[in-house]
Amino acid sequence: MDASIVSSSTAFPYQDSLNQSIEDEERDVHNSSHELNLIDCIDDTTSIVNESTTSTEQKLFSCNYCQRTFYSSQALGGHQNAHKRERTLAKRGQRMAASASAFGHPYGFSPLPFHGQYNNHRSLGIQAHSISHKLSSYNGFGGHYGQINWSRLPFDQQPAIGKFPSMDNFHHHHHQMMMMAPSVNSRSNNIDSPSNTGRVLEGSPTLEQWHGDKGLLLSTSHHEEQQKLDLSLKL
């Protein structure tokens, strides 16, 4: 039996060589398949990297106003809302500036300086009625007629805006004008006379010294006129 097997194996030696060649071919095919798998794996990794880069490039969002880039649409939306708030504030400031330049200062003048000035007069010992009822005259051409200061109420007692002054104040001013009428007429008559054409007021405020063609003329003092005015007002 064993002798027959040996004889058969020796009788077909070419069959063994054929089997060996087939095994070698199968081994080569298997090795080549492994090499192809490695190449495919490298290609897969490169494709994955390329896809990741393209995905990151697609996720970048840029702002149209300042060209800043953001990685999410939510961040870009908040940034654009901040730009909108800035624009609305800028427009509001421009409208306020335009209205202020067109209509002037909306609050007008403050009454505090006038009130403080009135208090300063009180601190210096000057009374309000002596200021309001004081009668003044100025030097120069036309000063011969005198100038009447209307009596002015203190700042705290002035009527509010939109209210007319009372009739008592109107009668008081009218009475004051009627009492001053004779003195004004007498001064106008003295001016018309040719002897008093070149008079100049000089000296102290209580003594008026007039120079004319006929010599020195002394007029009544300012103090006496003030006393007459006070007496007339008391009546």
Curated annotation (Swiss-Prot):
Additional notes on this entry: Seeds over-expressing ZFP3 are insensitive to inhibition of germination by abscisic acid (ABA). Plants over-expressing ZFP3 are dwarf, have reduced number and size of siliques, which contains few seeds or are empty.
A GO CC annotation given for this chain: nucleus
Comp. bias regions, Polar residues: 186-198
Molecular-function annotations in GO: DNA-binding transcription factor activity; transcription cis-regulatory region binding; zinc ion binding
GO biological process per UniProt: abscisic acid-activated signaling pathway; negative regulation of abscisic acid-activated signaling pathway; regulation of DNA-templated transcription
Disruption phenotype: No visible phenotype under normal growth conditions, but mutant seeds are hypersensitivite to inhibition of germination by abscisic acid (ABA).
Region feature (Disordered): 186-206
Keyword annotations of the record: Abscisic acid signaling pathway, Metal-binding, Nucleus, Zinc, Zinc-finger
Triggers of expression: Down-regulated by abscisic acid (ABA).
Lineage: Eukaryota, Viridiplantae, Streptophyta, Embryophyta, Tracheophyta
Physiological role: Acts as a negative regulator of abscisic acid (ABA) signaling during germination and early seedling development. Involved in the regulation of vegetative development and fertility. Modulates red light signaling in seedling photomorphogenesis.
InterPro entries given in the database record: ZFP3-like (IPR044246), Znf_C2H2_sf (IPR036236), Znf_C2H2_type (IPR013087)
Keyword Nucleus attached: yes
Domain of life: Eukaryota
Tissues expressing the protein: Expressed in the chalaze of seeds, hypocotyls, cotyledons, roots, emerging lateral roots, leaves, sepals and stamens. These data suggest that ZFP3 is expressed in most organs, showing high expression in vascular tissues.
SUPFAM superfamilies in alphabetical order: beta-beta-alpha zinc fingers
Subcellular location per the Swiss-Prot or TrEMBL entry: Nucleus
Protein name, entry field: Zinc finger protein 3
Zinc finger C2H2-type: from-to: 61-83
